[in-house]
Amino acid sequence: MFKTFVGAFKNKDIRKKIIYTLLILVVVRVGSLLPIPGVDTNYFSSLLSGINTGDLSYLSAFTGGSFERMSLFALSITPYITSSIIMQLLTIAIPKLEEMQKEGEDGRKKIASITRYVTIGLSLIESIAMAVGFGRSGLIKDSAQLSTLHYVVCIIVVVAALTAGSAVLMWLGERITEKGVGNGISIVLLINIISGMPSDFATLYSTFVAPKTPAKGVLAAVIILAILIVMVVLVCFLQDGERRIPVQYSQKVSGRRTVGGQSTNIPLKVNTAGVMPIIFASSLMQFPVIIAQLFGKSYEWTRYLSSSYWCRVEAPKYSIGLLVYIVLLIIFAYFYTSITFNPIEVADNLKKAGGVIPGITPGKSTSEYLNKILNYIVFIGAVGLLIIALIPIMCTGFFNASVSFGGTSIIIIVGVVLETLKQIESQMCNRYYKGFLSE
């Protein structure tokens, strides 16, 4: 990894892209510290401090702490992520969008444009809900003393600032994709997660290391480090692990030449769905809890949905929520994989191109074979995701040490780093061959 970065900095063009990316990330972090005019950030922080941190940990990680501070980038890129998920689901339900997706680069540009508009719409809705819902309760400074007109103006300012902040982050992410290195949105999400890690490590230290004797403290630190390393290795396996299905193409005689006959493979990734099953399952379980707690309501049933209660030894009945979470994660793993990989479509394309999986009849038998292998691989990937997701949850329940970087964050960090390194290496190879051919 370090050799890749050293080699990249030796190349002038790639070095410029890396510096450009770093400068934009500085802008992102500065924007996350800029307060919104008229907002009492201290009040909002105190409001959130009364909420179980386990329920807002993923939101805190994705926004880099901007949500608690109610800064310019408080919504972060979560509206864009939600919009992308919505568009992926709509491509299945709406045939016109599915056709647009198959049009190649032009179709992808149209879908990207629609995604931007959906992002702005979602940002506006979320901003209005936050400003109006919490305005009179203290989010707006001195709201009780403000006139109706002045209060409405403050609401408009907050809504405009939050919506504009989300739009600016989306634009900055696209600039990184276009002129920098890596996927811009993923890079922004990565820096937000990393920015919250120092406080998380401080929490781990104060909970497991500081209260103990030096010998036990060192042992606890070694165990924590070992768990993190195991999680990273497991994520690397899930991200890069794949089952390759061999494919043989038939030979065709064109004049005096024999065309085709080459062998290739269909790579089926162990974790085809990526981090989406965890996000879907967590959001579905935590949304009712967050809404109830933000509005000052406390119900017994919310504890079954709250991850901070699932692994408490003194209250094992709440583990029912954990079982529901496990079932949801597995269901979403299969569901999202069915969106990204269609065995029937792949089998049909192979048949049209003259490709055959050795020992499998083209057509229906091929699709059934691919579906069988895919179901097996998805199950392995889902189990791996469960292990990664449950370790932080168990840490929260057994030891009451909630940290914002959970399994989702580790998957995103490792995935984005690997993807960015591969892109840098690819650009280095392209530069090398161009230089070689020009000599």
Language model features: what each stretch is:
Residues 1-101, 106-439:
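N-terminal cationic and glycine-rich segments that engage phosphates or anionic surfaces
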